A protein has these predicted regions:
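Short alpha-helix in the alpha/beta-hydrolase fold that links the catalytic acid
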Residues: 89, 210-220
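C-terminal catalytic histidine-bearing segment of alpha/beta-hydrolase fold enzymes
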Residues: 222-270
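Bacterial signal peptide processing site
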Residues: 20-22
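C-terminal motif of bacterial Sec signal peptides marking the signal peptidase cleavage site
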Residues: 16-18
Length: 270
């Protein structure tokens, strides 16, 4: 196993433990009410479809109806899988003028409970190279679309997906990276391959990704000159932006989403 895969295995092991800890606090599967909480404005100006982008893996593609060339985002799901929560976030982002491909690292499976989610995430931990290939294929799929500016593609994910967003950045050239409370790499030498800005969203009460680790990550980015914007929301814990979780914090979630849109607009639309 190469050092990159070993690092990814270690990162996923820590993240799976963090997700499991969060699930033990009573985090249920998303419901229709939970999905409604994620809706951010009018999405009537978009179209969506399921697309095959890697082997038999189907992703959820959301894009503006109007003709044009748009920046794009590879969106990566939490440990539950490509569920309705993530699809709603893809719709919301597409409505802001992005082509969004929400990937499926589980090949069609979605965890119905924390045990199933842990097993699905554990399979990725056992074969991390395939997950990297999956996400890299998503980038290439977007580059091949006629309506995508192939110089303006970002990655974005939450929790498990936040960690994978960073891992994609370590393995593929992008234009921006967004990490919501994902496990972090704090070795500046390893991070130095990243040549574009990073947005990080975290909670001060997140015991799985403590503030000390976030600060080390920020310091490592600064050490090698990687532009970054790190926000630590006081008084909220892990997965605070997930309305199906016990830590859901709607005000902080709204603010984080606004900061995410500002960041992506600045890095991808200018």
């Amino acid at each position: 196993m190469g050092w990159k895969n070993l690092i990814l295995v270690m990162a996923l092991s820590l993240l799976i433990a963090a997700c499991a800890q969060q699930a033990q606090t009573g985090q249920p599967q998303p419901t229709e009410k939970n999905v409604d909480a994620l809706k951010n404005g009018d999405t009537s100006g978009i179209i969506t479809e399921d697309v095959i982008y890697f082997g038999s893996s189907k992703g959820f593609l959301a894009k503006p109806k109007n003709e044009g060339v748009y920046p794009a985002v590879v969106m990566i799901h939490e440990w539950w899988g490509l569920n309705d929560n993530i699809k709603e976030m893809a719709r919301s982002l597409a409505a802001e003028g992005y082509v969004v491909l929400a990937v499926d690292l589980y090949n069609g499976k979605v965890g119905k409970n924390s045990t199933e989610a842990g097993q699905l995430a554990g399979a990725i931990r056992s074969n991390p190279a395939v997950a990297i290939q999956n996400m890299k294929a998503a980038v290439q799929y977007l580059k091949n679309l006629y309506n995508v500016n192939d110089d303006k593609i970002a990655s974005m994910g939450w929790c498990f997906g936040g960690a994978m967003s960073l891992q994609l950045a370590l393995n593929e050239k992008l234009a921006a990276t967004v990490i919501y409370y994902g496990n972090l790499e704090t070795n500046s030498t390893k991070l130095s391959v990243i040549k574009w800005p990073i947005l990080g969203i975290f909670g001060s009460n997140d015991t799985s990704i403590p503030v000390e680790t976030v600060k080390k990550f920020e310091a490592a980015l600064n050490e090698v000159g990687i532009e970054n914007e790190i926000h630590i929301y006081e008084g909220v814990g892990h997965a605070f932006a997930n309305p199906s979780g016990m830590n859901y914090a709607p005000e902080q979630t709204k603010d984080a989403w606004e900061k995410t849109l500002e960041f992506l607009d600045r890095e991808l639309k200018v």
